[in-house]
């Protein structure tokens, strides 16, 4: 019965044996610590510590890279009661055996009888666990009583980070320990240091270590071998404080400079003497500008001063006043046109009266400077009729029965000079188109009556309403009312197809400014003028009417 029972239990024990071995290995790894560092060239140093390690057991570290064909093994040597260490030599000291992409599998193997037992395992990334070799070749370059210059070298450092290094140094003074020594940090690759504030004739020791800036688990290298040096003794009778002499020299120079400047400013005889010393040859401006020198007595400042007061150049002054635009009815007296101080009365726009205006832009050409060029005011005259278009029959029948508009009285005094009409010759020069009509207008004696100048309704119906009037010309000072230059009634009747008798021998030819217009002429003019609701004439419109004369 015992044999059958053992037969089915044996396969079960074989299956459970690997599991028991892995549990034992995990227990061993849980109480051990395995740490390795790469020196960036061809050396991997490892330290393994184990609690309750077996006595008289040999252990070793085996390295197996994933991208290389070689493998290396080193014997762990005891460094303390529970720790061992070894160095994996991968090749020549300065050869680059590993790169940043390599991963090395490290195992700690211990012998148990005739078999090797795995005690620890690690996937090692060389450039994430860097520790360089300690600096070498420390030497004193220069030593004085209070300072010392020391240099060193770095061995077996990879070219991957040879420019990305930092250093720490410490100096051991008498009566202190290395742990108490202050650390001096160099954040760049600087293989020398200048120690200051040292005591003369004193013995010191110096150490330095290095660390690359690359790697997550990178650590400082071991401290270098101590370098002992001694400062020079101080000379007899010499001040032991070096900065005091420099301070005295600086203060003496500053006081001397201040005294020299004071003497140069306050000494009256310094000017000619200084010119002779500096050999300054300044020319006399009076030799070249004799007229200015005689006018201002040799004062150069008056030569360069402005002839105008400073207020003339002030941008904050009052702006020049601009002449107002006045619009008055034709029936108003002329004196109201030039009263600038008073506000003009609003014109009552009706369908029976035309309006006239006089605009002057004298204010635009006013200057404050005494030598400025004065420009004479330019006057612009224009008319407009704001009434709406009426029926010709109703217009004739509804003509005002009152007296005809009386001509305005001529101006006098300053007002007459302000807004006057041009002379006959100037008017012809200003608007030569007055002579370019089909024939000069003719007037009959007694033309002032309204009934004599009025046309029959039958003739008024035949007159075209969109007839374009001739260019306007300003009247003479004797007749200030502005009347458009129009063809005579005979010409209008001929165009309408009616027979009109020729003028008698007593009917002379005259221009429209030679007689006062009648009421019928105003009505005929108003009936022919197109509706114009604009109250202003621009400069371009004036030039368009008469391009030979520019305003």
From Swiss-Prot:
Cystine residue pairs: 36-46, 59-110, 74-86
Compartment annotation: Cell membrane
Pfam families xref list: IL2RB_N1
Domain Fibronectin type-III span(s) in chain numbering: 134-234
Leader sequence segment: 1-26
Motif residue range(s): WSXWS motif: 220-224
Glycosylation sites recorded in the entry for this protein: 29, 43, 71, 149
GO cellular component terms given for this protein: cell surface; cytosol; endosome; external side of plasma membrane; interleukin-2 receptor complex; membrane; plasma membrane
Residue numbers spanned by region Disordered: 389-416, 432-486
GO function terms (MF aspect): coreceptor activity; cytokine receptor activity; interleukin-15 receptor activity; interleukin-2 binding; interleukin-2 receptor activity
Cytoplasmic side stretches: 266-551
Keyword terms of this UniProt record: Cell membrane, Disease variant, Disulfide bond, Glycoprotein, Host-virus interaction, Membrane, Receptor, Signal, Transmembrane, Transmembrane helix
Segments crossing the lipid bilayer: 241-265
UniProt motif Box 1 motif: location: 278-286
Membrane topology: Single-pass type I membrane protein
InterPro entries: FN3_dom, FN3_sf, Hempt_rcpt_S_F1_CS, Ig-like_fold, IL2RB_N1
Domain of life: Eukaryota
SUPFAM superfamilies (alphabetical): Fibronectin type III
One GO BP: signal transduction
PANTHER family, A to Z: CYTOKINE RECEPTOR (PTHR23037), INTERLEUKIN-2 RECEPTOR SUBUNIT BETA (PTHR23037:SF30)
Quaternary structure, from the entry: Non-covalent dimer of an alpha and a beta subunit. IL2R exists in 3 different forms: a high affinity dimer, an intermediate affinity monomer (beta subunit), and a low affinity monomer (alpha subunit). The high and intermediate affinity forms also associate with a gamma subunit. Interacts with SHB upon interleukin stimulation.
Entry similarity comment: Belongs to the type I cytokine receptor family. Type 4 subfamily.
Disease linkage: Immunodeficiency 63 with lymphoproliferation and autoimmunity: An autosomal recessive disorder characterized by immune dysregulation resulting in lymphoid proliferation, dermatitis, enteropathy, autoantibodies, hypergammaglobulinemia, and immunodeficiency with recurrent infections. Patients show increased susceptibility to viral infections, particularly cytomegalovirus disease.
Domain notes: The WSXWS motif appears to be necessary for proper protein folding and thereby efficient intracellular transport and cell-surface receptor binding.
UniProt function note: Receptor for interleukin-2. This beta subunit is involved in receptor mediated endocytosis and transduces the mitogenic signals of IL2. Probably in association with IL15RA, involved in the stimulation of neutrophil phagocytosis by IL15.
Name of the protein in question: Interleukin-2 receptor subunit beta
């Amino acid at each position: 019965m015992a044999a059958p029972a053992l037969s089915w239990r044996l396969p079960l024990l074989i299956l459970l044996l690997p599991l028991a071995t892995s549990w034992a290995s995990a227990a061993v790894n849980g109480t051990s610590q395995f740490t390795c560092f790469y020196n960036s060239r061809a050396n991997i140093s490892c330290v393994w510590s184990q609690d309750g390690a077996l006595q008289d057991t040999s252990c070793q570290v085996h390295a197996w890279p994933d991208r290389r064909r070689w493998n290396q093994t080193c014997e762990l040597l005891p460094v303390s009661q529970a720790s061992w260490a070894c160095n994996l030599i991968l090749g020549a000291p300065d050869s680059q055996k590993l790169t940043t992409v390599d991963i090395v599998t490290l195992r700690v193997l211990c012998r148990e009888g005739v078999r090797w037992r795995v005690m620890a395992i690690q996937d090692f990334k060389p450039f994430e666990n860097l520790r360089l070799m300690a600096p070498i070749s420390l030497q004193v370059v220069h030593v004085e009583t209070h300072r010392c210059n020391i240099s060193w070298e770095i061995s077996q450092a990879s070219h991957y980070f040879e420019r990305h290094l930092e250093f720490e140094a410490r100096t051991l003074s008498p009566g202190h320990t290395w742990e108490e020594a202050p650390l001096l940090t160099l954040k760049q690759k600087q293989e020398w240091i200048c120690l200051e504030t040292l005591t003369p004739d004193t013995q010191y020791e110096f150490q330095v270590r290095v660390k690359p800036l690359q790697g997550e688990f990178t650590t400082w290298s071991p401290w270098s071998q101590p370098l002992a040096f001694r400062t020079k003794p101080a000379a007899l009778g010499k001040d032991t404080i070096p900065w005091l002499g420099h301070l005295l020299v600086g203060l003496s120079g500053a006081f001397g400079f201040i005294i020299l400047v004071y003497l140069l400013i306050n000494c009256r005889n310094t000017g000619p003497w200084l010119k002779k010393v500096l050999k300054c040859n300044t020319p006399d401006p009076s030799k070249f500008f004799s007229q200015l020198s005689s006018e201002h007595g040799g004062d150069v400042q008056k030569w360069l001063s402005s002839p105008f007061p400073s207020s003339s150049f002030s941008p904050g002054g009052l702006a020049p006043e601009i002449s107002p635009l006045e619009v008055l009815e034709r029936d108003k007296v002329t004196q109201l046109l030039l009263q600038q101080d008073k506000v003009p009365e609003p014109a009552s726009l009706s369908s029976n009266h035309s309006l006239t205006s006089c605009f002057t832009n004298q204010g635009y050409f006013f200057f404050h400077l005494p030598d400025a060029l004065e420009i004479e005011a330019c006057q612009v005259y224009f008319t407009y009729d704001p009434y709406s278009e009426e029926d010709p029959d109703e217009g004739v029948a509804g003509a005002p029965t009152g007296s005809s508009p009386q001509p305005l009285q001529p101006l006098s005094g300053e007002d007459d000079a302000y807004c006057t009409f041009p002379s006959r010759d100037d008017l012809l020069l200003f608007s030569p188109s007055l002579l370019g009509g089909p024939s000069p207008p003719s007037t009959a004696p007694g033309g002032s009556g309204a009934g004599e100048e009025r046309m029959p309704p039958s003739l008024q119906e035949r007159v075209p309403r969109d007839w374009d009037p001739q260019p306007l010309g300003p009247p003479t000072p004797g007749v200030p009312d502005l009347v458009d230059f129009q063809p005579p009634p005979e010409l209008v009747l001929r165009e309408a197809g009616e027979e009109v008798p020729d003028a008698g021998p007593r009917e002379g030819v005259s221009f429209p400014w030679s007689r006062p217009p009648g009421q019928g002429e105003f009505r005929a003019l108003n009936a022919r003028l197109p509706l114009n609701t604009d109250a202003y004439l621009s400069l371009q419109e004036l030039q368009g009417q008469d391009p030979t004369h520019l305003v």
